[in-house]
Amino acid sequence: MRRRLSVWAYPWDLADEGVAAALDWLRDAGFDAIELCPNYHAISTFAPRNLQRSIHYSEQGAVYFPARAERYGRIKPRVFDEPAVLGAYAQAAEHAASNGIELNAWVIGMFQPWIARAYPDTAVENAFGARSFATTCPASPDVQEYLAALVADLCDQYPVNSALLERPGHAEFAYGWVRERILIDFDPWTRFLAGLCFCENCLTAARTHGVDAVEVRERVARELRDRLSRRQESDDLEATIAARVDSDEELRGYLESREQSATRVVEGVQRALRGTGTRLSLTHAATGWGATGLRLADLLERIDGLLLPDPTDESDEAKRQAALARSARREIELVVMLWGSDEFDPGGPGFAARLDRIARLRVDRVGVYNFGLLRPETLRQIGGLVREALAK
């Protein structure tokens, strides 16, 4: 498989610069792939290279291609209201092909505040019965149907090589909250419990799995109240979960039902992509009990690509996931995201060490974040250094 240098991009930045001009620039800078988002979550960005829209502000997120409402079920896509931005995907498909650039879709999964607000029963709900409207729950059949329809709609319209699902599983505690105020320390186990969803869809899934879901919710709520009343010592989350599920069959069953719900999301998208020629990739899987419920071993026969954890911050897990993916019976493309910002000196030893770790993982694609948010000269410099690292 050819190693590719990619860049993550927003359609509004391509549209404002001119899609053809932007892709010409990327080609000349040595990039041969692009990860273009067809939908996005709530975001506020500042783009130094965008002469028309230095600030993009979206409180709840939107869909950024001309989605066809008749293809969807209960949840209808909330389409962005600027025709030029909606036209970016079609232009990107045309000009990417002529420039030898691979077009990939960067698809947001559960972090969809607009869906949670418009369809409150899809929102995450904690053990105390409080909803978070930042994210939707993967146990919702409507959410599963919507995400599959969205990806199929996109890939039926455009020649997308790979669709990467970002966070299609359960959200961690406080993920996506707006200017959150949390003034107490959460140890890993308390944070894990606080992030468990007990919406009606999750309770139904657990009951179907043979679990007394209400009893689990009540026990989690009691334990949370107790742990929140005083400071807790830090713990090894992986070891704690393993010990608890070994001694608590009901909790094990509940966590298993979470994993089944997350897996159903991936299965639904996989089915929807049949016949399109588009490969399916995902992010935030885990080799063990994970907060997202995406157990990698259960997904190897359903995916064609995997975004690995950060090889610096989570080096051991990145190595485990790479090894597991390579043991699969099908070829799985390994991808790494490389953040670029003024906090990183591309010419410094820290950045060089990061590139060395990426090279040793022997990944197939490195995506630099982000086309619009970096200075052009910084993006070009990072791209050149990545190219050198991949060639070693």
Predicted regions and their residues:
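Short, acidic/polar
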Residues: 13-28, 141-154, 288-301, 317-322, ...
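Aromatic-lined carbohydrate-binding/catalytic grooves of carbohydrate-active enzymes
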Residues: 31, 35-83
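Polysaccharide-binding and catalytic clefts of secreted carbohydrate-active enzymes
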Residues: 129-275, 279-299
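Active-site clefts of carbohydrate-active enzymes
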Residues: 234-251, 326-349
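Substrate-binding cleft of secreted/luminal carbohydrate-active enzymes
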Residues: 308-318, 335-391
